[in-house]
A protein has these predicted regions:
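Interdomain motor-coupling "hinge/lid" segment immediately C-terminal to the ATP-binding subdomain
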Residues: 2, 10, 139, 145-253
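Accessory nucleic acid-recognition modules appended to NTPase machines
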Residues: 65, 208-367
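Conserved lysine of the Walker
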Residues: 45-46
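Short glycine-rich substrate-engagement loop in P-loop NTPases that contacts/grips substrate
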Residues: 69-101
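Domain-level recognition of nuclease-like catalytic cores that cleave nucleotide substrates
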Residues: 407-437
C-alpha cells in the first residue's frame, strides 16, 4: 500500500494543474488549523484546491512540498482509519530530508470517504511541519463533533456552484463597478444563459442535451454515493422516489406527514423517522435545503410546514418532470441559493394575518432583510398581493426596507411601511457580496 501511495504522490507532482475559472471565494489559512472546503459534488472543490496549489507554486513553494491525495481514487480504497499513517510514511520515504525541516502542504480531497479520518489529521498536524487543506461533500464536516475530534484545529468554508458573478468571470465579462450600457446588455444576455445552465462548472457552455445528461448523472451519483451507500440504506427506491418528489416540488411547502404518506402511497414502508433521516442526508450532501418558518419558538419552527430548495435551479429543470415546477419556482430557487451561499440562517415569514414572505435572512450582525420573489408585478392583483405582504412584514418587524426580486422589473415603491425595492434578478445577484467578512 505504501508503494501505491508513493506512486500517487509522484504522479500528481508531474501532473499539469487544471485550475479552471478563478473562484471569488478565498479560504484564509490560520497557523495550526486545517482549512476545510465543503460542498456538493462537482461544485468545484477540487479545482479550487488546484488554484490554491498554483498560488503556492507561484509564490515559490517547491512542487515536491505538495502532497495531494484524492480519497475517491480507487487505488486508495483499502485505506482505513487505522492505516492512514501510511500517508506520512510514504511521503517521507520519498523526501526524508524534508521531515521536520520544511513545511509540507497537504491537500486531502474528499477525505470523508475514510470514516474516522479526524484523529489522523489532528495527529499529523501536531507531529509534522505542515499546512493541511481538506475537501469534502458532507456538511458533517461543519459539525461540532468534528471540531471536538480535531481539538479545535479546523476552520470550514462552504463552496457552492458558480455564483452569477463567477459565471460572468467564466464568460470573461467584466462585472465589477458601474456598468456602461454595453456592459449591462452583455450582463443581461449572460444572465439568460446562466438561467438556462445554472452554476455547475462542468455544464457551462454545453448543449442542452449534454447539460441535462450531466445533471441527471450528478443527481444519481449524489443519491447513490452520498446517501444510499454512505448510510447503507435498506430501501433505496424510497430515497430515490422522495428525491424526485422534492425536486418536482421545489420552492413548495412540505411536512414530514405528507412525505411519509406519499411514500406509503407508492408502497414504501418508510416511517416518519426514516423520512426525517433522508431529509437530513439530502441537506448533508448539499443537494436539497430545508427552510423553516421564522418563529421565536423552536417547536413551532419544527412543526410548521417547511420549504424545499435545490442546490441549483438548472439542475431542477434537468431532473424534474416539469409538471409542478414553473419559472416562478425556479426564480425563487435561484434567489435562495444566492442568499444561502452567503447566509446560513434563512427562513420564510408569515405575517399575523397569514401573508407569506419568501425569505427573511439573518445577517451576521443579527440585522434582518426581507426578500420576496415574483416573476412579474405587471398584473395589478399580483402587484397588490406582493407589496401588501412585504409592507405588512416590514411593519411587524420594524424594518424600513424590503426587496422584491423579479425577472426584469426595476423600480422603487414608497409606502407608509418604508421603501420597497423592485429589482431584476441579474441586478440582485450582482449586488450581493461574494463573501461575508
Amino acid at each position: 500500500m505504501i508503494e501505491t501511495i508513493k506512486s500517487i504522490i509522484l504522479d500528481f507532482q508531474e501532473t499539469r494543474l487544471e485550475t479552471g475559472v478563478l473562484r471569488r471565494m478565498m479560504i484564509e489559512t490560520v497557523r495550526g488549523k486545517a482549512a476545510i472546503c465543503i460542498g456538493v459534488r462537482r461544485g468545484g472543490k477540487s479545482t479550487y484546491m488546484f488554484q490554491v496549489i498554483q498560488r503556492l507554486l507561484d509564490g515559490g513553494i517547491p512542487r515536491e512540498n505538495i502532497l495531494y491525495l484524492n480519497f475517491f481514487d480507487d487505488r486508495l480504497h483499502n485505506l482505513r482509519q487505522d492505516n492512514l499513517g501510511m500517508i506520512a510514511e510514504a511521503y517521507y520515504a520519498i523526501y526524508p530530508e524534508k521531515k521536520n525541516t520544511e513545511t509540507v502542504y497537504c491537500f486531502f480531497d474528499e477525505i470523508q470517504a475514510v470514516p474516522g479520518w479526524e484523529p489522523f489529521v489532528d495527529r499529523f498536524m501536531r507531529t509534522e511541519k505542515c499546512e493541511v487543506y481538506l475537501t469534502g461533500s458532507s456538511a458533517n464536516m461543519l459539525s461540532k463533533e468534528i471540531a471536538t475530534q480535531m481539538r479545535g484545529r479546523a476552520l470550514s468554508w462552504e463552496m457552492f456552484p458558480f455564483s452569477f458573478r463567477e459565471f460572468l468571470d467564466y464568460k470573461r465579462i467584466e462585472s465589477d463597478g458601474t456598468l456602461s450600457t454595453k456592459k449591462r446588455l452583455l450582463v443581461q444576455k449572460a444572465f439568460e444563459e446562466y438561467w438556462e445552465t445554472g452554476g455547475f462548472p462542468e455544464v457551462s457552455g454545453l448543449t442542452r442535451h449534454l447539460r441535462i445528461k450531466i445533471h441527471q448523472e450528478y443527481f444519481h451519483t449524489i443519491l447513490f454515493r452520498d446517501l444510499i451507500e454512505r448510510h447503507d440504506v435498506s430501501h433505496p427506491k424510497a430515497v430515490i422516489d422522495l428525491a424526485h418528489w422534492l425536486v418536482d416540488n421545489t420552492a413548495s411547502l412540505y411536512s414530514i406527514n405528507s412525505l411519509t404518506g406519499y411514500l406509503k402511497s407508492l408502497g414504501h414502508k418508510a416511517p416518519k423517522s426514516a423520512v426525517s433521516d433522508y431529509l437530513e442526508w439530502f441537506e448533508d450532501a448539499y443537494f436539497l435545503f430545508t427552510v423553516r418558518i421564522f418563529d421565536a419558538s423552536l417547536a413551532r419552527r419544527d412543526t410548521n410546514p417547511k420549504r424545499i430548495y435545490c442546490i441549483d435551479h438548472a439542475m431542477v429543470t434537468s431532473v424534474s418532470s416539469g409538471i409542478l415546477v414553473n419559472s416562478g419556482h425556479l426564480l425563487e430557487n435561484l434567489v435562495f441559493t444566492a442568499l444561502r451561499r452567503l447566509y446560513p440562517e434563512i427562513y420564510y415569514y408569515k405575517t399575523k394575518i397569514g401573508r407569506e414572505i419568501d425569505f427573511i435572512v439573518l445577517m451576521q450582525d443579527r440585522t434582518r432583510i426581507l426578500v420576496q420573489v415574483c416573476e412579474s408585478l405587471t398584473a395589478p392583483q399580483t402587484r397588490k398581493r406582493e407589496t401588501t405582504a412585504l409592507s405588512e412584514a416590514m411593519a411587524e418587524l420594524g424594518l424600513k426596507t424590503g426587496t422584491i426580486v423579479t425577472r426584469n422589473e426595476d423600480e422603487r415603491i414608497e409606502d407608509e411601511a418604508g421603501t420597497i425595492r423592485v429589482v431584476p434578478a441579474w441586478r440582485f445577484l450582482l449586488d450581493l457580496a461574494e463573501s461575508v467578512e
